[in-house]
């Protein structure tokens, strides 16, 4: 599924090249707090691991977990997330040499199996300047700085049973 899916009337110029594109796709296991059974059933060990993590259980918004596939010679433009109630974990699985990721002023090359957490409200971008596919497993965890009372407040403010458009 294309990761960026905006209607044409929405003003999202930074996503023009990737909107509805197969250059950046996602295989969602969890999307806006709902299990995507068609995909999750093929990944029982991954789902069991996710169940043991402190995921942001926010109705209609989280948790989220997906395999992010970036086509050869594709760049994800600089962008930011919408709130820091959760952190995002990236676990590189298939990362051809030369693929990179930037958060704020820190640029790093992907290393297979070397996960890292970051606050995606900080500007970030990624690139696959190679001729091979790049695959990273991405999932959310609660920001550890939040108390349970604060998590409940986040659930009430952000959560919707009808389904928000993610965190």
Regions found by a protein language model. Give the residues of each.
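Fe(II)/2-oxoglutarate oxygenase catalytic core
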Residues: 1-66, 70-83, 96-99, 129, ...
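Hydrophobic side chains in beta-strands
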Residues: 29, 69, 93, 103, ...
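Short, surface-exposed charged micro-motifs
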Residues: 66, 90, 125
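A short hydrophobic beta-strand segment most commonly corresponding to one strand
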Residues: 88-92, 117, 132-147
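A short beta-strand-loop-beta hairpin characteristic of the jelly-roll/cupin
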Residues: 93-112
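A generic structural motif
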Residues: 96-98, 121-123, 132
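Conserved metal-binding segment of the jelly-roll/cupin
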Residues: 109-123
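C-terminal SET catalytic tail plus cysteine-rich post-SET Zn-binding segment of SAM-dependent SET-domain
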Residues: 114, 124-128, 140
